[in-house]
Swiss-Prot record:
Belongs to the eukaryotic ribosomal protein eS25 family. Residues 14-38 have a biased composition (Basic and acidic residues). The gene is rps25e. The lineage of its organism: Archaea, Thermoproteota, Thermoprotei, Thermoproteales, Thermoproteaceae. Keywords: Ribonucleoprotein, Ribosomal protein. This is Small ribosomal subunit protein eS25. Residues 1-38 are annotated as: Disordered. The keyword Ribonucleoprotein applies. It comes from Pyrobaculum aerophilum (strain ATCC 51768 / DSM 7523 / JCM 9630 / CIP 104966 / NBRC 100827 / IM2).
Length: 110
């Protein structure tokens, strides 16, 4: 009844070339991955960073959690908590609150 036929010599050669090219690309990707270090984010905030954020926030026009998270390398959830804490302390005033974000201004500017 037949079955699968044997590949021709040219087909075998093409297959071998493709495999070599794929292996070369894999090796290239692995080298690339090793060169770029992963960006670390802070999950738990220490008092020193909190004080730095509190000081910096007073000089900004508007403050969003994304700005704080990207500037200090912290998670968005931590940035939300920091800004809410600063609001409770009276350093910030909530201007607008949407579904996903909150916009604050320093208390002295409001």
């Amino acid at each position: 009844m037949g079955g699968k036929k044997k590949p021709t010599l040219s087909q075998l050669a093409k297959k071998a070339e493709k495999e070599k090219a794929q292996q070369a690309q894999k090796a290239k990707k692995e080298v690339k991955k090793e060169e770029t270090p992963a960006k670390r984010t802070i999950q738990v905030l220490d008092e020193k960073v909190f004080q730095a954020i509190a000081k910096e926030v007073q000089n900004m026009r508007v403050i969003t959690p994304y700005e704080i998270a990207s500037k200090y390398g912290i998670k968005m959830s931590v940035a939300f908590k920091v800004l809410r804490n600063l609001k409770e302390r009276g350093d910030l005033v909530l201007v607008a609150k949407g579904h996903r974000t909150e916009i604050y201004v320093p208390a002295k500017r409001s």
